[in-house]
C-alpha cells in the first residue's frame, strides 16, 4: 500500500472495509480519515441531512492538526472563510456592566476556528461527498452483528458486511448497547443548556433587538453574561449574517412548553434582561433546543467482544459543553482509529480497535474532568468578591498542543503490549501532575 508524505494512501488500498454509523462530527471525521488511510468506507446516517441545531463550535489546535491533511488544505481554508470575524471577547455581569474585554483576532488565533456548528458539518459532509465515499442519508440501521472475520449492520432487512463497524451515533447511541455490554447510565449533572441560532433578518427591523448588529459593526461580536448559577452567551457569526445565543443553568430546568420562554424566565431578574429579552424573544421556535447536560466517566469497553465493532465520540465519552472539546475529541478518535487500522492491517483489525481504545481512554477521561471543573467555574461567578472563584488555564498545552497522529506512531507498540500482555501503561495527551 503506497503512502505519501502526509500519511495518505490510495483509495481502497488497505483492503479494509469500514462501516460508519452516524454522521455528526465524529462519524464524518472517521469517514474522511479512514478514506485518507486507504480504507473503503460505507456510511449510514438516519437523518436525511446533517444535524442542524446548535450554536457555535470551536475547532481547537489539537483537532485542527488532523484537518490540515484534508483536501490539500481546502477544508482548513473553508473553516477560515466562515469563522467568526471577531476582534474582542466581552464579559459582563448580570447588570450589563462590562467586566472584561479581551482582544481576539480570528485571522491570527493559531489553529483555532470558531464557527456555526451546522457550517462545520456542511464543510465536512461536502468534503466527504467529494471523495466519492458510499453515503446513505436518511437510512436507519436496525441491527449490528459480528463474526470472527467480519462485522456489519442490518439496513432494511439486508445484512451489509465489512471488516469493522464504527458506532458514532451520539450520547443517546442506539448502537452502543449492541457493541458494549456495559450499562451506560447518564445521570444528570443538575444542569441544562439552551442553544439557538437564526438568521439576522429576524431582528434586523426591530430597534430593540438589532442593537447586536450595530455592536458587531463590519464583523462579529461575542458577549458573555455571568450571574449566580447562570451564564448567557450571545453574538453574531459569518459577518453578522447569523445570531446565536446559549444559556447554561446549574439547575435542571428543561422547558415544559417553549425553550425561549424558559430562558426569558431564567434571566428575568437580571437588570440586563431588558436589553437581552427583545433579541431572545425573536428566536424562531424551531431554531432553539434545550438539553439536560450529562457527564460520566468514559465507557470502559469501547470494543465489542470479537473486536470488530467500536464506539467513538459522544457515544463512548460524552463531554459537558464547558469542556469545549466534544467535536474535537471525536475528530481525534477518528484519526487515531484510521491510523491504527492502517498500521495493523487487514489481518489485525481487532487489535487496531483495541489499541485505539487504549490510546484514547486516559485522555478523554482527563478532559471530561476538566469539563466539570470548567462548568463549576462558569456557574460560580461572584462579582461582589472578585468574579471567578475558580480559575482554569484557558489553553493548557497538554490539551491544545497534543498531536494525536504523532502519538499513535510513538505509542502504538506500547498500546499493543497493554492489549496483548495486560501491561499497565500511561499514555500521552494527559496533564502531568
Swiss-Prot record:
It comes from the Eukaryota. One of its GO terms (biological process) is alkaloid metabolic process. The keyword Cytoplasm does not apply. Notoamides have been shown to exhibit antitumoral activities. Notoamides A-C show moderate cytotoxicity against HeLa and L1210 cells with IC(50) values in the range of 22-52 mg/ml, but the IC(50) value of notoamide D is greater than 100 mg/ml. Moreover, notoamide C induces G2/M-cell cycle arrest at a concentration of 6.3 mg/ml. The active site is at residue 195. Keywords: Alkaloid metabolism, FAD, Flavoprotein, Monooxygenase, Oxidoreductase. GO terms for molecular function: FAD binding; monooxygenase activity. FAD binds at residues 45, 117, 314, 327. InterPro entries: FAD-bd, FAD-dep_Monooxygenase_BioMet, FAD/NAD-bd_sf. Pathway: Alkaloid biosynthesis. FAD-dependent monooxygenase; part of the gene cluster that mediates the biosynthesis of notoamide, a fungal indole alkaloid that belongs to a family of natural products containing a characteristic bicyclo[2.2.2]diazaoctane core. The first step of notoamide biosynthesis involves coupling of L-proline and L-tryptophan by the bimodular NRPS notE', to produce cyclo-L-tryptophan-L-proline called brevianamide F. PANTHER family: MONOOXYGENASE (PTHR13789), MONOOXYGENASE, PUTATIVE (AFU_ORTHOLOGUE AFUA_6G12060)-RELATED (PTHR13789:SF236). This is FAD-dependent monooxygenase notI'. The lineage of its organism: Eukaryota, Fungi, Dikarya, Ascomycota, Pezizomycotina.
Amino acid at each position: 500500500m503506497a503512502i505519501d508524505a502526509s500519511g495518505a494512501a490510495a483509495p481502497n488500498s488497505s483492503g479494509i472495509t469500514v462501516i460508519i454509523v452516524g454522521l455528526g462530527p465524529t462519524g464524518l471525521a472517521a469517514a474522511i480519515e479512514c478514506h485518507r488511510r486507504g480504507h473503503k468506507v460505507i456510511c449510514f446516517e438516519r437523518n436525511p441531512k446533517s444535524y442542524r441545531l446548535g450554536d457555535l463550535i470551536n475547532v481547537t489546535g489539537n483537532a485542527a492538526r488532523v484537518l490540515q491533511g484534508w483536501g490539500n488544505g481546502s477544508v482548513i481554508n473553508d473553516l477560515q472563510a466562515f469563522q467568526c470575524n471577531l476582534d474582542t471577547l466581552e464579559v459582563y455581569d448580570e447588570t450589563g456592566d462590562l467586566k472584561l474585554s479581551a482582544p481576539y483576532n480570528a485571522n491570527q488565533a493559531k489553529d483555532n476556528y470558531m464557527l456555526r456548528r451546522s457550517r462545520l458539518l456542511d464543510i465536512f459532509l461536502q468534503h466527504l461527498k467529494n471523495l466519492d465515499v458510499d453515503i446513505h442519508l436518511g437510512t436507519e440501521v436496525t441491527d449490528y452483528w459480528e463474526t470472527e472475520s467480519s462485522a456489519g449492520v442490518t439496513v432494511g432487512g439486508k445484512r451489509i458486511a465489512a471488516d469493522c463497524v464504527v458506532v458514532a451515533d451520539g450520547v443517546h447511541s442506539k448502537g452502543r448497547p449492541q457493541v458494549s455490554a456495559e450499562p451506560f447510565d447518564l445521570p444528570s449533572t443538575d444542569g441544562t443548556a439552551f442553544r439557538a441560532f437564526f438568521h439576522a433578518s429576524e431582528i434586523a427591523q426591530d430597534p430593540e433587538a438589532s442593537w447586536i448588529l450595530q455592536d458587531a459593526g463590519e464583523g462579529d461580536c461575542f458577549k458573555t453574561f455571568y450571574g449566580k448559577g447562570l451564564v448567557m452567551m450571545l453574538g453574531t457569526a459569518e459577518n453578522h449574517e447569523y445570531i446565536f445565543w446559549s444559556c447554561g443553568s446549574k439547575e435542571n430546568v428543561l422547558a415544559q412548553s417553549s425553550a425561549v420562554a424558559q430562558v426569558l424566565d431564567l434571566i428575568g431578574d437580571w437588570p440586563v434582561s431588558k436589553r437581552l429579552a427583545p433579541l431572545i424573544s425573536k428566536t424562531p421556535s424551531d431554531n432553539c433546543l434545550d438539553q439536560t447536560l450529562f457527564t460520566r466517566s468514559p465507557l470502559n469497553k469501547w470494543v465489542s467482544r470479537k473486536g470488530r465493532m467500536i464506539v467513538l465520540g459522544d457515544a463512548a465519552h460524552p463531554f459537558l459543553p464547558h469542556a469545549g472539546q466534544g467535536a474535537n475529541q471525536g475528530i481525534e478518535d477518528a484519526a487515531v482509529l484510521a491510523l491504527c487500522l492502517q498500521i495493523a492491517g487487514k489481518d489485525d483489525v481487532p487489535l487496531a480497535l483495541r489499541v485505539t481504545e487504549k490510546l484514547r481512554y486516559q485522555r478523554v477521561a482527563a478532559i471530561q474532568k476538566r469539563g466539570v471543573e470548567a462548568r463549576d467555574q462558569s456557574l460560580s461567578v461572584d462579582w461582589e468578591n472578585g468574579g471567578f472563584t475558580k480559575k482554569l488555564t484557558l489553553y493548557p498545552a497538554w490539551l491544545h498542543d497534543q498531536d494525536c497522529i504523532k502519538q499513535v506512531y510513538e505509542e502504538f507498540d506500547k498500546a499493543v503490549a497493554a492489549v496483548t500482555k495486560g501491561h499497565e501503561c500511561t499514555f500521552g495527551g494527559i496533564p502531568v501532575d
